[in-house]
């Protein structure tokens, strides 16, 4: 995503412009929200809307009311069913999770995941939930590499094995 500045014009990508003009039926003078994916949320006015071209003029930067002072990073082993992994990525983006890492374990049935597809799902969820920060999708790595490279202060592992359930305490 480009860096956005107030009082400048920005052209939406062909795909985004077509969606904005044809599907949402937006026209010149309509106001839209733009994000840079890094926490910036901007109000803009459409100044040109023709078929596959949409130009927006940024009017002002909006306050990020969802900003927090911590980072949430979730790792998961992709399931056999790709749709479940995509669903997880979508929900993570809607909840505002900062980063999702995929890992391969000794029980993994799927070791090849198209992160480009998950990134598209995340962008769609970002737009639908009016979030300003994009959820980063990291490529699949083995479990040991993931754990050894984790820089978070607190790390937790959740599992569905057995009937015993432990609760996180403060």
Predicted regions and their residues:
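Short secondary-structure boundary/capping segments
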Residues: 1-2, 64-66, 147-148, 169-170
């Amino acid at each position: 995503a480009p860096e956005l500045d107030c009082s400048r014009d920005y052209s939406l990508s062909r795909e985004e412009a077509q969606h904005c003009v044809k599907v949402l039926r937006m026209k010149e003078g309509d106001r839209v929200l733009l994000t840079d994916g890094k926490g910036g949320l901007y109000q803009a006015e459409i100044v040109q809307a023709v078929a596959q071209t949409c130009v927006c003029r940024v009017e002002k930067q909006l306050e990020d009311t969802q900003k927090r002072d911590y980072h949430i990073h979730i790792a998961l082993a992709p399931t056999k069913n790709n749709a479940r992994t995509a669903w997880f990525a979508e929900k993570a983006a809607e909840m505002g999770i900062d980063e999702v890492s995929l890992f391969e374990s000794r029980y993994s049935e799927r070791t090849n995941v198209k992160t480009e597809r998950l990134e598209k799902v995340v962008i769609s969820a970002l737009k639908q939930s009016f979030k300003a920060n994009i959820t980063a999708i990291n490529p699949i790595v083995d479990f040991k590499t993931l754990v050894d490279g984790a820089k978070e202060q607190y790390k937790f592992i959740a599992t569905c094995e057995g009937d015993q359930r432990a609760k996180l305490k403060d």
